[in-house]
């Protein structure tokens, strides 16, 4: 017999009051006694924590908190621990005698939440001699020890041989190990299972009837019929999948054309782009190689051009330097010519202006005299006109007013006085005291003559003054000329210096006359010198180009050698041209052949693709058209054989399906009529009674009952007789057995068991021998075993049938493919490979291109040598005529000598040119420098004295003139007499007025005419002075300009300057012509270099871009290729025939396919998005992703259970035939999968009956349990009325509700829920879906109601409630219920655990002192009978004679709490007999 596992001990480490304490647990009852706060609850809490380390469930409270929903924040665990590492460990030994230590490491977490950290662990293989406290503590000294952390504990255990340490991160894993090793009774898979286990332990700990358990007894006691539910779920899943597959088939049938279109267009879209990129990659590689070759060639050309450019640039620099000198000389010669011409023009202007000045000087002197005379006459006329005007005014005034006339007389008297005053002034000025008015006229003539004499004398002195001034001016002019030529000097030295300057001027003129001959001689020598230098330069350049120095004597021989080389190179170039033409002709022929092969290649590739596909499909290699036709005949024969085998397998599969359906009938009935007869007779099928028989016993019982194993067991045969009359709907042989279905046994037969057989003695004269069947079908286990084997066989047959069907279809498809191949490609498929020939021709073409390139290089070198030879000959042609110049060494010295002489002559010419005019002017007037006219000042004084005398004479004459004019006023002495004769006076006044006016008019006209004449004279004088001053100033400016020019303006200077300029111009023109030639050549060379540089840069840029593009494309292409190979679509995309299309054709093909695809995937969001992303030309891998997505989409649409292939293209080819076959097969399968409502009702009823029988067996173990007034405890199981009605309708009236169960839109669960709602419209289903309700209705537990009843005193059987029982009675009743639950769990889990393990049983009971002695004894007896361990706690030892008792006393020493523990084993002898009514309990419990 299997021994039950036991808990050996409980170890607490570092708990409150327990530092390191191990409690050895009794095999039955362990009692913890002690006062309040002694540590009993802490000990039990440690046990529970090690058993269920789930902080979400643990809540340790005292009995006053029982049933409360909230408690202290730490759930009672934090306060029971000490600071630091704590342990709680359970030492167990299981049925296999394996020692297992399980436990938890606990540690308080700092914080106000008072949390605790828990780590579960397990130790296996620990020797019995090692105590748990030794593992987790380390002794420091005699009175100190240290608790080991978990990692040190792990290291310590790993060091021990044979010991296994496991730390768990999941409570599920921890409980799974405990279940497998037999420590707990049930596998706790989820938090819900742990919660049930904890509620059971909690109910046991605190005692009483737990409402949490009694309310959900179904979950605790009734096992979940997962097999039935899974069967229904599998059936519904199969039906759902079947219907979905049928729907998919219908959709696939409707989308078949779309599939073809989609795969065709997707292949065209992606393959065209794929091959275009492949072609572009090859083209880019070819371009990159071509760019690299061109780059190398261009670099060589650029280097040659650079060498050529350097040579020409050097020569151009030399010519530029020479041109600069020539330009400077030419510019100087031109400037000199311009200066000479300007000086000549200036000299002509000076001579012309000097003549004009002499003429103006004469005219100016004459005009001065005329103006002086006119001024004198003007003054006289002004005096006369003024006197006449005064006279007229007086007379007019007198005539105007007579009174005024009187006044005039008075005035005349005044005038008389004035006349007397004037006479006196004249006497004084003229020094004539005897002067009278009458003699004044005579004296006036005398003094006028005197005035005229003084005027003549003044004019004579003025003329002398002018002549002296002229002499003084000539001296100053000559003196200034000498100062201008020689510089400042004394006036007395002017004569000597002037003579010296005149002699020096003669010498300088003689030297200046030699300038032109010297200049001509120098020009001739300089020309020869330049030719000599040019010849030397040409020779040096030639030597540099030839890379060797040559003597003058070697040049003629070298000239002949170069001409011979030119002739030979010309012949070589001509021969190379003919060879190049031959190579190019061969290249063109190769190109033409390649083009023709490329046109034939796509047709051949298409034939090869078709041939390769056929070879891949059939696994054969075809070398000729005869092989193809022969294989086609073999294919037809194979197709016929496969069809025959497929039909045979299909028949066997149908037979297996029928047997599975027959064995799957509920209750083991192979005939549905037996179930109806059993219900009609009120009996039970014998197969249902033995439905739980084990697989090992099935052969025995099958042979025992033989043909009667399908009998119906009825309580009374006599009551069945009336039903047998007229019974027709039944099997041919119907067996009826009388017996109690609840307690039926096999005692109805007399049986002798033999080896694999039985002999059944039916009667004294009738025996039956039956062998054990090889495949027993009696009992659920046997049927399930047989069904399982049949399912396996059916799977094999289905797979074989599908394989054969696929082979048939494959063969048919191959036949069609061969037919198409023969019709389309057989003529060209076995021809030679055009691509291989193309590769050979391309290799030859590359060789030709390389030969052409080498030939071009050689020809280029010969051309360069030819050009170099021609340049050498040209250079020698220029050098050879100048050999005599190259031999003249004294030419440079002669040039220097002539240049020095020319410098002296030019210096003399510059002196003559600068001072020639001054010397010419000085030469005629040099004699005036001999004496200096000093009397000029005395003459100026005499002239001033004569002017004063002339003014005095003029005043005297004027005074006498005034006396003469006032001569009439002397007659005013008789003005008194004239007053009496006023009339006569008036006439006289009128006459006098007329005379006076006539005189005034004459005076005015004379004054006006003379004033106009004077004005004209003054204007002429001013004009002459202005002209004279202007021309004088211009003459001075011209003389200064001529001096500034510094050029001698002789007659031959202009001609010499012009000749020199023309010579330099000719030299400059020649130099410029050569320079222009060099510049053009250099510009052409630079342009060629620029073109080569730009070409080189472009080539470098193109090469690097192309290289980068190739590298980038390579990375992208590698990604594309990797994606293509990973997804296995290379065969579809790498269409070699597309490689011969142009990029535009491929792009057009891809664009057309893209347009068609946009329409095709318009309704598919995923494909539409992927297609839109694939349109990016920079991301070719996205097109592959689209193609893969299309394939994946097709794979999803064409399911593998319909079409067994991974290739959608092949699937489309198969689809036409396969879909119709699958439609028929799936339709029949759906009919087979569907389960009837009556079968469901029978299954649920049988399950309910089985569980009722099991509960009844459990009740038998509790019938004699008594606590106080409670005499017995039992579980009452009833079927709910609403659910019972549902079962009745399912079994009897299901035809009325076939609209629900035959609907394709509803699953069976949904139809069951709809039926339940139809039968119970008053029940509110809430928010639950029909599927959820239907799944609940398929669980038999929802059909049952369970409650606990007690037989208490006189009340009889009543519902067990805490309010109707005492505390002790409630504790005992609750403990009984818990024992029942534990036993039920063990029964349920027996099939999940090993057969050799019986799990530990342990419950708790706190505050057990509330039970009386009889109840305590009952508990002890219950533990002994059920082999259960019990831990109880009480203030005192309630039964010291049994079990093991621990006395706990909490003590405080030096602020440290410590629980003192004393253990005591029971000393009572074994009871002589068990409790009344419990003798059969162990057998029943087991």
From Swiss-Prot:
Binding site for ATP: 34-41
Any GO CC annotation of this UniProt entry: cytoplasm
Keywords tagged on the record: ATP-binding, Cell cycle, Cell division, Chromosome partition, Coiled coil, Cytoplasm, DNA condensation, DNA-binding, Nucleotide-binding
SUPFAM superfamilies, sorted: P-loop containing nucleoside triphosphate hydrolases (SSF52540)
Region Flexible hinge, residue ranges: 666-783
Taxonomic superkingdom: Bacteria
Keyword DNA-binding applies: yes
Notes concerning its domains: The hinge domain, which separates the large intramolecular coiled coil regions, allows the homodimerization, forming a V-shaped homodimer.
NCBIfam families cross-referenced by the UniProt entry: PRK04863.1
Name the UniProt record assigns to this protein: Chromosome partition protein MukB
Species whose genome carries this gene: Escherichia coli O9:H4 (strain HS)
Gene: mukB
């Amino acid at each position: 017999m299997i021994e039950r596992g036991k808990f050996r001990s409980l170890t607490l480490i570092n708990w409150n009051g327990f530092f390191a304490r191990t409690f050895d647990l009794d095999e039955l009852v362990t009692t913890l006694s002690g006062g309040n706060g002694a540590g009993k609850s802490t000990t039990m809490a440690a046990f529970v924590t090690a058993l269920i380390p789930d902080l979400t469930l643990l809540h340790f409270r005292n009995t006053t908190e029982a049933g409360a929903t909230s408690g202290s924040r730490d759930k009672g665990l934090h306060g029971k621990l000490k600071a630091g590492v704590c342990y709680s460990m359970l030492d167990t030994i299981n049925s296999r005698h394996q020692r297992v230590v399980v436990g938890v490491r606990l540690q308080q977490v700092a914080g106000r939440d008072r949390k605790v950290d828990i780590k579960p662990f397990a130790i296996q293989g620990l020797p019995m001699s090692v105590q748990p406290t030794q593992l987790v503590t380390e002794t420091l000294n005699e009175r100190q020890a240290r608790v080991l952390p978990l990692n040190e504990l792990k290291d310590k255990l790993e060091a021990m041989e044979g010991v296994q340490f496991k730390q768990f991160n999941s409570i599920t894993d921890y409980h799974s190990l405990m279940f497998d090793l037999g420590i707990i009774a049930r596998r706790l898979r989820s938090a819900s299972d742990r919660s049930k286990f904890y509620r059971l332990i909690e109910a046991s700990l605190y005692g009483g009837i737990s409402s949490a358990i009694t309310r959900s007894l179904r979950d605790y006691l009734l096992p979940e019929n997962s097999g039935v539910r899974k069967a229904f779920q599998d059936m519904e899943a199969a039906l759902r999948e079947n219907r979905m597959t049928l729907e998919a088939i219908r959709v696939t049938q409707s989308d078949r054309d779309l599939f073809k279109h989609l795969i065709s267009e997707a292949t065209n879209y992606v393959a065209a782009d794929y091959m275009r990129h492949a072609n572009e990659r090859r083209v880019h590689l070819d371009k990159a190689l071509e760019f690299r070759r061109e780059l190398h060639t261009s670099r060589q050309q650029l280097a040659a051009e650079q060498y050529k450019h350097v040579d020409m640039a050097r020569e151009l620099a030399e010519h530029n330097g020479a041109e600069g000198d020539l330009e400077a000389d030419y510019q100087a010669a031109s400037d000199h010519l311009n200066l000479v011409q300007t000086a000549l023009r200036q000299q002509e202007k000076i001579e012309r202006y000097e003549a004009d000045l002499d003429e103006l000087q004469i005219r100016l002197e004459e005009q001065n005299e005329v103006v002086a005379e006119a001024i004198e006459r003007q003054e006289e006329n002004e005096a006369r006109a003024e006197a006449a005007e005064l006279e007229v005014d007086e007379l007019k005034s007198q005539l105007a007013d007579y009174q005024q006339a009187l006044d005039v007389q008075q005035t005349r008297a005044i005038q008389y006085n004035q006349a007397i005053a004037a006479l006196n002034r004249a006497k004084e000025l003229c020094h004539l005291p005897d002067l009278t008015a009458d003699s004044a006229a005579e004296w006036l003539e005398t003094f006028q003559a005197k005035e005229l004499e003084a005027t003549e004398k003044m004019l004579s002195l003025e003329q002398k003054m002018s002549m002296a001034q002229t002499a003084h001016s000539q001296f100053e002019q000559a003196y200034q000329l000498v100062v201008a030529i020689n510089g400042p000097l004394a006036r007395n030295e002017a004569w000597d210096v002037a003579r010296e300057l005149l002699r020096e001027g003669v010498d300088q003129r003689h030297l200046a006359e030699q300038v032109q001959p010297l200049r001509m001689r120098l020009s001739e020598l300089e020309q020869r010198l330049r030719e000599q230098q040019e010849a030397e330069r040409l020779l040096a350049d030639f030597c540099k180009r030839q890379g060797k120095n040559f003597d003058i004597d070697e040049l003629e021989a070298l000239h002949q050698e170069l001409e011979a080389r030119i002739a030979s190179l010309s012949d070589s170039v001509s021969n190379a041209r003919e060879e190049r033409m031959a190579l190019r002709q061969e290249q063109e022929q190769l190109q033409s052949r390649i083009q023709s092969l490329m046109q034939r290649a796509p047709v051949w590739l298409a034939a090869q693709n078709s041939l390769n596909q056929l070879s891949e499909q059939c696994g054969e290699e075809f070398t000729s058209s005869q092989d193809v036709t022969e294989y086609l005949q073999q294919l037809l024969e194979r197709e016929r054989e496969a069809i025959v085998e497929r039909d045979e397998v299909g028949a066997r599969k149908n037979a297996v399906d029928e047997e599975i359906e027959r064995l799957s009938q509920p209750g083991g009935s192979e005939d549905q009529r037996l179930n109806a007869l059993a219900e009609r007779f009120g009996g039970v099928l014998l197969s249902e009674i033995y439905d739980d028989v084990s697989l090992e016993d099935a052969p025995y019982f099958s042979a025992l009952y033989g043909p009667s194993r399908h009998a119906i067991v009825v309580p009374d045969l006599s009551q069945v007789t009336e039903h047998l009359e007229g019974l027709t709907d039944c099997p041919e042989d119907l067996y009826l057995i009388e017996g109690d279905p609840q307690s039926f046994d096999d005692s109805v037969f007399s049986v002798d068991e033999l080896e694999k057989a039985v002999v059944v003695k039916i009667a004294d004269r009738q025996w039956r021998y039956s062998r054990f069947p090889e495949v027993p079908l009696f009992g659920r286990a046997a049927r399930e075993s047989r069904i399982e084997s049949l399912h396996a066989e059916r799977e094999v047959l289905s797979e074989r049938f599908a394989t054969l069907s696929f082979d048939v279809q494959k063969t048919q498809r191959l036949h069609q493919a061969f037919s198409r191949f023969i019709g389309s490609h057989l003529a060209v498929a076995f021809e030679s490979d055009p691509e291989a020939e193309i590769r050979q021709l391309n290799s030859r073409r590359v060789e030709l291109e390389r030969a052409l390139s080498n030939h071009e290089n050689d020809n280029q070198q010969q051309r360069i040598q030819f050009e170099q030879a021609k340049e050498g000959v040209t250079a020698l042609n220029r050098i050879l005529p100048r050999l005599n110049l190259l031999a003249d060494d004294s030419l440079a010295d002669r040039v220097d000598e002539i240049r020095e002489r020319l410098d002296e002559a030019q210096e003399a010419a510059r002196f003559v040119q600068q001072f020639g005019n001054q010397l010419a002017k000085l030469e005629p007037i040099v004699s005036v420098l001999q004496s200096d006219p000093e009397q000029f000042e005395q003459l100026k004084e005499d002239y001033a004295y004569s002017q004063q005398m002339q003014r005095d004479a003029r005043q005297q004459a004027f005074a006498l003139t005034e006396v003469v004019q006032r001569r009439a006023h002397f007659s005013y002495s008789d003005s008194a007499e004239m007053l009496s004769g006023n009339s006569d006076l008036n006439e006289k006044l009128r006459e006098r007025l007329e005379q006076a006016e006539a005189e005034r008019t004459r005076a005015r006209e004379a004054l006006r005419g003379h004033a106009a004449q004077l004005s004209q004279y003054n204007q002429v004088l001013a004009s002459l002075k202005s002209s004279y001053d202007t021309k004088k100033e211009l003459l001075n400016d011209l003389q200064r300009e001529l001096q500034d020019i510094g050029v001698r303006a002789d007659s031959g200077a202009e001609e010499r300057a012009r000749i020199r300029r023309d010579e330099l111009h000719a030299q400059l023109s020649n130099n410029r012509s050569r320079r222009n030639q060099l510049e053009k050549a250099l510009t052409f060379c630079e342009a060629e270099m620029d073109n080569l540089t730009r070409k080189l840069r472009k080539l470098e840029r193109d090469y690097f871009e192309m290289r980068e593009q190739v590298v980038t494309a390579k990375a992208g292409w590698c990604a594309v290729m990797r994606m293509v190979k990973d997804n296995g679509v290379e065969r579809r995309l790498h269409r070699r025939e597309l490689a011969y299309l142009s990029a535009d054709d491929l792009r057009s093909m891809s664009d057309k396919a893209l347009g068609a695809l946009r329409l095709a995937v318009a309704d598919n969001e995923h494909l539409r998005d992927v297609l839109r992303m694939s349109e990016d030309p920079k991301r070719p891998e996205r097109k592959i992703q689209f193609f893969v997505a299309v394939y994946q989409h097709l794979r999803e649409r064409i399911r593998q259970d319909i079409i067994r292939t991974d290739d959608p293209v092949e699937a489309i080819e198969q689809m036409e035939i396969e879909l119709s076959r699958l439609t028929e097969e799936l339709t029949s399968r759906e009919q087979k999968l569907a389960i009837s409502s009556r079968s469901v009702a029978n299954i649920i009823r049988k399950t309910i009956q089985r569980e009722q029988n099991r509960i009844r067996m459990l009740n038998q173990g509790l019938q004699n349990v008594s606590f106080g007034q409670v005499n017995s405890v039992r579980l009452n199981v009833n079927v709910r009325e609403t659910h019972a009605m549902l079962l009745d309708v399912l079994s009897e009236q299901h035809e009325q509700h076939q609209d629900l169960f035959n609907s394709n839109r509803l699953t069976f669960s949904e139809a069951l829920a709809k039926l339940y709602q139809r039968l119970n419209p008053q029940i509110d289903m809430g928010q639950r879906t029909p599927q959820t309700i239907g799944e609940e209705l398929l669980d038999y537990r929802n059909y049952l109601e369970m409650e606990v009843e007690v037989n208490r005193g006189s009340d009889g059987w009543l519902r067990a409630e805490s309010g109707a029982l005492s505390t002790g009675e409630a504790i005992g009743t609750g403990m009984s219920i818990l024992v029942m639950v534990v036993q039920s769990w063990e029964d349920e889990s027996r099939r999940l655990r090993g057969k050799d393990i019986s799990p530990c049983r342990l419950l708790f009971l706190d505050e057990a002192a509330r039970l009386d002695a009889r109840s305590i004894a009952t508990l002890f007896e219950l533990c002994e009978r059920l082999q259960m361990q019990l831990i109880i706690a009480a203030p005192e030892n309630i039964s010291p004679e049994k079990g093991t008792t621990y006395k706990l006393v909490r003590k405080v020493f030096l602020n440290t709490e410590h629980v003192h523990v004393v253990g005591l084993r029971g000393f009572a002898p074994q009871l002589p007999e068990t409790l009344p009514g419990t003798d059969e309990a162990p057998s029943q419990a087991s």
